[in-house]
Amino acid sequence: MAHFTKPPEGSWTEHYGLGTGPVSYEDSISPAHYELERDAIFRRTWLNVGRVEQLPRVGSYFTKELDAARTSVVVLRDSDSAVRAFYNICRHRGNKLVWNDYPGEETSGTCRRFTCKYHGWQYNLQGECTFVQQESEFFDLDKAYYGLVPVRTDVWEGFIFVNLDTADTTPLHEYLGDLAAGLVGYPFDRMTQVHRYRAEVRANWKLFIDAFTEFYHAPVLHAKQAVADESRKLQSVGYEALAYQVDGPHGMVSSWGGMSPPKDLSMVKPIERVLHSGLFGPWDAPDIGIDELPPGLNPARHPSWGLDSFLFFPNFMVLIWKTNWVLTYHYWPTSYNSHIFEGTCYFVPPRTARERLAQELAVVTFKEYGL
């Protein structure tokens, strides 16, 4: 018996016409298929690479390695305070431009110009080539022709996206569609206390996404990670969600989430009782400055709502929790059977040491839960 309302077709699968036959596994084990994905997906769609808070002032920058797209980009705030991105490649000999100790590692900082470590060519924050060593020794050199190659960049609700496809004219907001439109106005910008973790996973990137977008596994895999009353709830309704939405390549799952705080405090760990925090985040929801949630959150307006999980194709997931914190996941493929998994927790800045520790407890607990 269903615990939550289902569509008239009887199932969400039939409601969205997803098909009911077996699904091929070939796309997750085929090296040839992965090579097709690299060009058809990661070089042709909008990819989230960070947030505007990573660029607090003119000259702030960070790099992003896009192994699946065979490239690296540098994202910066230019001299006009605009967010821009360029291929992280010097136009002289094609060497990586921005890096510190190891060329393959991402880096960040603040600067007035970028200088290539090979021959010293320099570029300003607008990407223009401003200095060439021994320029007079070159023949008919026009520095204006050798600026950094720009990458199409746009921002949605503070999230920075890049698109490597010069032929794609689809605006970011149009690409993200109605699911993203339903979140406009949510105060992501208030959640500037950030904790990140990263793991190298020996699995196809889509397999991890599949695991994080279904709740079929929850009563089995996570039963012993939950307190008694939560575990019973998992067993009774854990296979169901409040609502699903599919919009083009994107999707959303609305879930009853966890109990914060649990009903039986005697069943939680002592540190959780002291800090008022645990697996599903701090128990005490901070003020985020809004009286009503945007229409895209808890679309069923169910009183048992706990979180909504949004997947924006191809590899960006946003989880928004009832207790006013946000978790994002990124899945960056490095081969047909490996990827980099990134988890980032966003909180309202803590006002006390206890609030800070509550957030950190939630982060380390969720890391164990997620990995």
Q: What is the predicted function of each stretch?
A:
Residues 42-46, 95, 217:
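Generic structural signal for secondary-structure transition and capping sites
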Residues 13-40:
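Low-complexity, highly charged intrinsically disordered N-terminal segments
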